[in-house]
Amino acid sequence: MNDVILAELKKIEEKENVKIIMAIESGSRAWGFASPDSDYDVRFIYIRRPEDYLKLEGIRDVIEWQLDDVLDINGWDLKKVLQLLHKSNPTVFEWCASPIVYYQTEEFEELKKILPDFFSVKKSLFHYWHMAETHYREYLKGEEVRLKKYFYALRPLLAAKWIVDKQVAPPMLFDELVSAELEPALLPEVERLLEMKKNLPEMEKGPKVHSI
């Protein structure tokens, strides 16, 4: 699949006349709890030609390339990324922390060096807490629950605890967050759910787990 993804990135550069400085995996594969039928959520950052940024009519700062059952590929202009970084947007930090990197350049390495200067504990904490609360309220109150929704609530909750405890951006990998922040009494149940999630289809449901 890596070769397929790299080939698609090359097509993007040629068709859009841009330079991609990094491409990573986001979503469940990068978090470490993908299902057998999970798609590939590829995200990239790109730079346009200098003259493109001087056009009076402006130009889109997002490229949406492919969305199907296998590949979900889209990217942001570096200008957009820097604007969001200035606001301490958590998505930028997550992209830059992904454990699955398909492609990167020296420009991306330089970008990563300045990340800590823009991290806001308050903004990031609110982001993850709100995400966890929303998933709990909308998806975890029924008697049957889609397995992945447990992790879409647990991961941001643990990320919020990480931020409170360490005052730095949380890691992408769910296992790292579990090791550092999960209450030991919940570990067996979470490990059981994680094993099920990794071996069952993406949309699989199960009885509500009341301990979580």
Predicted region positions:
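A structural signal for short, well-ordered beta-strand segments and their strand-loop junctions
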Residues: 22-25, 94, 163-165, 170
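A basic- and aromatic-enriched beta-loop-alpha substructure that forms the phosphate/nucleotide-
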Residues: 55-131
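Helical scaffold of the NTase/Pol beta-like nucleotidyltransferase catalytic core
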Residues: 1-24
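Catalytic metal-binding acidic patch
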Residues: 27-68
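Short loop/turn segments at secondary-structure transitions that flank enzyme active sites
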Residues: 48-51, 88-91, 134, 159-160
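Short His-Asn-centered micro-motif
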Residues: 26-27, 74
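Conserved nucleotidyltransferase catalytic core and NTase-mimicking acidic/glycine-rich helix/loop elements
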Residues: 112-212
